[in-house]
Each structure stands twice: as structure tokens, then as C-alpha cells.
Amino acid sequence: MIALVPAAGSGSRFGAPSPKQYLQLNGKPLMWHTLATVAAVPDVDEVAVVISPQDEWFDDFAWDLPKLSVHRVGGASRAQSVASGLAALACADDDWVLVHDAARCCLSVAAVERLIAALSGHAVGGLLALPVPDTVKRADIDGHVAATVPRNGLWLAQTPQMFRAGLLARALSSAAAEDITDEASAVERLGVKPLLVEGDAQNFKITYPRDLALARAILAARDEY
């Protein structure tokens, strides 16, 4: 099984001088924590990180992680980076691929193992996700409440998202002209249904500077590394 971590983004919303995956978090680059967790999963044979060909930061750090391979084939979008990473890896169609956000650095090994166990023998694949816990409002153009959306059946998608390499490559190719934000969206467009596997609230994506304090606290409380 291959874990693919797209990390070619610039992190423009973060407003930092370097992409957020390289910001220091408890003494190491943020992405180090992500890669270390995925590498610690026994079923994962390779951790392939996809970075931009113009990346100026990756080589500044000593990653010192097992199973790690680096591919400078990242594209302008997440979907392009994942598709290019798959092509660079030359996976067999039946190989399972776990795609995980570089910025979800508080992922646990247990959550990945839960996903793998749930998808053993599954025809399509699936993803970690959380049921929506709060009341959901739809806003109008002026920021007023237009409607309250029933939350029954609504889930918040997380990563990893796990699919067979052949299916994922076809899905990404088919959706190349679309603005998709995760692999499951591309797979759904083929008319198949990924499985939702309950994730973990700690597996959030670092998006804004305020997220770093929570990530520091979570990682400091762990003895994994």
C-alpha cells in the first residue's frame, strides 16, 4: 500500500513567508509530523510526498523518515498533484493508495488503521469523515440566513482517502476540467459510492495561524515520536 501526500500548495491563506507545511511545529516542520504518522502504519509500504518542481524548502530539512520517497511533480491544484504523483509511482491498478493532506498533521495511526480495516475487501474505497455535529445554516448573498439545512446524513470529509490506483487515476482524469476538492468527489462522478468511515476531530486541517496552537498541544501530549 502506498500513501501519497500532495504538498505542492503555497498556503496563501496562511500568510506565512513559506508554505505552511514547512512551518516549525514542536521543533520540526509541520509536514514531518504528517509523514511520520503515515510511515508508522504497518500496512503502508511507501510514503510518497509530491512537491512542486519549484519547491525551495524541502531540502532545507533533515526528514530522516522510513519509507519516504519525494516526487517533484506537483501541479497547480491538489488534483493535478495527486494525478502526477500516481503517474510517477507507476502503481498497478489494483494497488491501494492512501491520499492524505500534508496539513493534517495530527492524524493518528489508529485512525488510519481503522480506515484500512473498514475498506478491506470493499469494491470502491472510502475516506475518513465526521458526522456534522452542529446546526447548519445556508446564507443568502447578504449574509442573512436563507435556510436551515437538515444535518441528518451530512458528513465532513477528512483524509486519508483510500482508493485503488486505477480507479483513482481514471476518476481524476475524468474530472480534470472540474473544480474538485478531494479524491472522493472525483470518484463519485464515476457513479460509485465511497464508504464513509468515522474519523477523529483531532485530524483537522491546519488552515489559519490560530490552528497551530491546538496542533502544538495535541502533538505535545503524544508519545508517538
From Swiss-Prot:
Q: Pathway listed for it?
A: Isoprenoid biosynthesis; isopentenyl diphosphate biosynthesis via DXP pathway; isopentenyl diphosphate from 1-deoxy-D-xylulose 5-phosphate: step 2/6
Pfam family of this protein, just one? IspD
Keyword list (alphabetical) reads: Isoprene biosynthesis, Nucleotidyltransferase, Transferase
Q: Where is this site: Positions MEP for the nucleophilic attack?
A: 151, 205
**Marked site positions, Transition state stabilizer:** 13, 20
Query: What does it catalyze?
Result: 2-C-methyl-D-erythritol 4-phosphate + CTP + H(+) = 4-CDP-2-C-methyl-D-erythritol + diphosphate
Quick check: keyword Nucleotidyltransferase in the entry? Answer: yes
Question: Transferase: is it a keyword of this entry?
Answer: yes
GO BP annotations, alphabetical order: isopentenyl diphosphate biosynthetic process, methylerythritol 4-phosphate pathway
Its EC top class is transferase
Leader sequence residues: none
Output the InterPro entries linked to this UniProt entry: IspD, IspD/TarI, IspD/TarI_cytidylyltransf_bact, ISPD_synthase_CS, Nucleotide-diphossugar_trans
Which residues lie in coiled coils?
none
Q: What is its EC number?
A: 2.7.7.60
One example GO MF annotation: 2-C-methyl-D-erythritol 4-phosphate cytidylyltransferase activity
CDD domains, A to Z? CDP-ME_synthetase
What does the similarity note say? Belongs to the IspD/TarI cytidylyltransferase family. IspD subfamily.
Job of this protein:
Catalyzes the formation of 4-diphosphocytidyl-2-C-methyl-D-erythritol from CTP and 2-C-methyl-D-erythritol 4-phosphate (MEP).
- The protein's name: 2-C-methyl-D-erythritol 4-phosphate cytidylyltransferase
Naturally occurring in which organism (per UniProt): Chromobacterium violaceum (strain ATCC 12472 / DSM 30191 / JCM 1249 / CCUG 213 / NBRC 12614 / NCIMB 9131 / NCTC 9757 / MK)
Q: Which gene encodes it?
A: ispD
